[in-house]
Swiss-Prot record:
Residues 4-303 form the Protein kinase domain. GO terms for cellular component: cyclin-dependent protein kinase holoenzyme complex. Interacts with CKS1. This is Cyclin-dependent kinase B1-2. The gene is CDKB1-2. It comes from Arabidopsis thaliana. The keyword Heme does not apply. It is an enzyme of class 2 (transferase). It comes from the Eukaryota. Keywords: ATP-binding, Kinase, Nucleotide-binding, Phosphoprotein, Serine/threonine-protein kinase, Transferase.
Length: 311
């Protein structure tokens, strides 16, 4: 790791510490993710190797944060502690200095609160669908999409998906290591209800929540427990029925909930165009099989006024 000078710790990600660093020879900024992957005598677990090769392949899309290289650091052997040297994997990513959460916050708080421009939301959504469609076409679910995981290249106006593809080998814990609870606000109802057979539709639900948040500048469903999260969803969209969502009552964590009627979604996102409301409605369907796919979303009328040739 002599190649890099660590400048500051920028986060404690779901998978380990994240540092802003500089490549000494070029002066280029990178993000170093130190993964908590204890090696054994066998070396790097094959699951991790598969994930890394997948990540390298996926990061060929400009809408996915690029994985530049992987550094395997073996720490010097300490005979008093263990018989074999410990080693760490560092994933070296391109560095981007802001994320969608910070960007939304800057429009909500501070000296100049203002809505995000409708055309900007449209551009960000198109890029997000491009990135998600790219992942899904390779059979990869993100499973933890949220504004903090969407990094922005403000100069080029590009949105990129981060923290991707590690979700299987490194299993997403319920608590990040700073003991903040991993947010439930973007989690699909089938996951909250304990379904183990989920699909690409879980990511579409998350993208729908992110879409609404860009319009509202605050979370659509800000629950602080799995139960409260479901109640937030049911109060707005109505309590799901077996007719609407076949099999919902057989899910592991289904209980008898109060029966709420669906509200008018446009009241939750009053400044969104009718086409935008239609797209959001198709993303927040209870039955995962009925949710629009990322690929189909790219052709939705909401994007008709967008010059797609630039993407």
């Amino acid at each position: 790791m002599e190649k890099y000078e660590k400048l500051e710790k920028v986060g404690e990600g779901t998978y380990g510490k994240v540092y802003k660093a500089m490549e000494k020879t070029t002066g280029k900024l990178v993000a170093l993710k130190k993964t908590r992957l204890e090696m054994d005598e066998e070396g790097i677990p094959p699951t991790a190797l598969r994930e890394i090769s997948l990540l390298q392949m996926l990061s060929q899309s400009i809408y996915i944060v690029r994985l530049l290289c992987v550094e395997h650091v073996i720490q010097s052997k300490d005979s008093t502690v263990s018989h074999s040297p410990k080693s760490n994997l560092y994933l070296v990513f391109e560095y981007l200095d802001t994320d969608l959460k910070k960007f939304i916050d800057s429009h909500r708080k501070g000296s100049n609160p203002r809505p995000l421009e409708a055309s900007l939301v449209q551009r960000f959504m198109f890029q997000l669908f491009k990135g998600v469609a790219h992942c899904h076409s390779h059979g990869v679910l993100h499973r933890d999409l949220k504004p903090q995981n969407l990094l922005l290249d403000k100069d080029k106006g590009i949105l990129k998906i981060a923290d991707l593809g590690l979700s299987r080998a490194f299993t997403v814990p319920l608590k990040a290591y700073t003991h903040e609870i991993v947010t439930l606000w973007y989690r699909a109802p089938e996951v909250l209800l304990g379904s183990t057979h989920y699909s690409t539709a879980v990511d579409i639900w998350s993208v729908g929540c992110i879409f609404a948040e860009m319009i509202r500048r605050q979370a659509l469903f800000p629950g602080d427990s799995e139960f409260q999260q479901l109640l937030h969803i049911f109060r707005l969209l109505g309590t799901p029925t077996e007719q609407q969502w076949p099999g919902v009552m057989a899910l592991r964590d289904w209980h008898v909930y109060p029966k709420w009627e669906p509200q008018d979604l446009s009241r939750a996102v009053p400044s969104l165009s009718p086409e935008g409301i239609d797209l959001l409605t198709q993303m927040l369907k209870y039955n995962p099989a009925e949710r629009i796919s990322a690929k189909a979303a790219l052709d939705h009328p909401y994007f008709d006024s967008l010059d797609k040739s630039q993407f």
